[in-house]
Amino acid sequence: FPYTTLFRSWQSPDYSTLVIARMLTGLAHGVFFSIGSTIATSLVPKEKAASAIAIMFGGLTVALVTGVPLGTFIGQHFGWRETFLAVSLLGVIALVASLLLVPSSIPGRASASLSDQVKVLTHPRLLLIYAVTALGYGGVFTAFTFLAPMMQELAGFSPGAVSWILLGYGISVAIGNIWGGKLADKHGAVPALKFIFAALVALLMIFQFTASMQYAALVTVLVMGIFAFGNVPGLQVYVVQKAERYTPNAVDVASGLNIAAFNIGIALGSVIGGLVVEHVGLTQTPWIGAVIVLIAFLLIGLSGRLDKPARVALG
């Protein structure tokens, strides 16, 4: 990550090189979070696995909240190349911290064989969870991608106020991330996810009606932020649990594919949102996002029901 950011992004001679460097950086990003999830769960008792994942992803949400304004500040005052230089230095700090702070006694996993990796890609129970992840985030990002113009054009906030609203949304996301982990630890992944998805469906439908009412829209967005990423810990710990059961030799691969499903959902939501804005209008994105999240809610309910025979058999 520091190498691709420092020597490829910072010193990019042209735009094409910069794009390639960012793609390589994205590969490192996906690997980090897939392995990080399994490391986080291995450091704590099983009943605290979701909270451990929440703390790890909490770092991502804090970075998103603080990194965007800091990156903008550096770019405006020193130049865009210096922004990448600063990011690469942070990457070096993270590398050193990992070497010093992550225990070396964590038991390693055997490398997944090709057949194990294929099983991860084809096992219906894992594919079901990937679909839940992609649809859950696709629905949220159908509306969130256009949150700034909605708050400005529909709710009537100034551009400066919208920046503060997005910061507040990010803080809500960070809070929801930790809360979601505790919820999954206490009640189990499936009940927690069903509750969070149901709340997101309701909040997106409420936002459909409050988007044009300034203060009501603000409250809806801030509350929605708590639930938007609250499902991350539950989804990640759930896919790890299912992978340990169905593909025990490829848990890291399954974890990584769930991270890929997150990103697919974000891309999917952005595309759907763009099509909605182009053909139907900006005001219609919340309810369409709610329908997509509703499908995720139904699928996680189905996955939970499929778990029950296994529990009976084990008992």
Question: Which stretches of residues belong to each language-model region?
Answer:
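Short, small-residue-biased leader/transition segments that mark boundaries at the very start
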Residues: 1-6
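Paired small-residue
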Residues: 13-25, 215-223
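Cytoplasmic helix-loop-helix junction between adjacent transmembrane helices
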Residues: 15, 21-59
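Intracellular juxtamembrane helix-capping segments at the cytosolic ends
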Residues: 32-44, 230-246
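C-terminal membrane-cytosol helix-exit motif in multi-pass small-molecule transporters
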Residues: 88-107, 300-303
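Helix-to-loop junctions at the C-terminal end of transmembrane segments
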Residues: 177-188, 277
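A late C-terminal transmembrane helix in Major Facilitator Superfamily
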Residues: 245-280
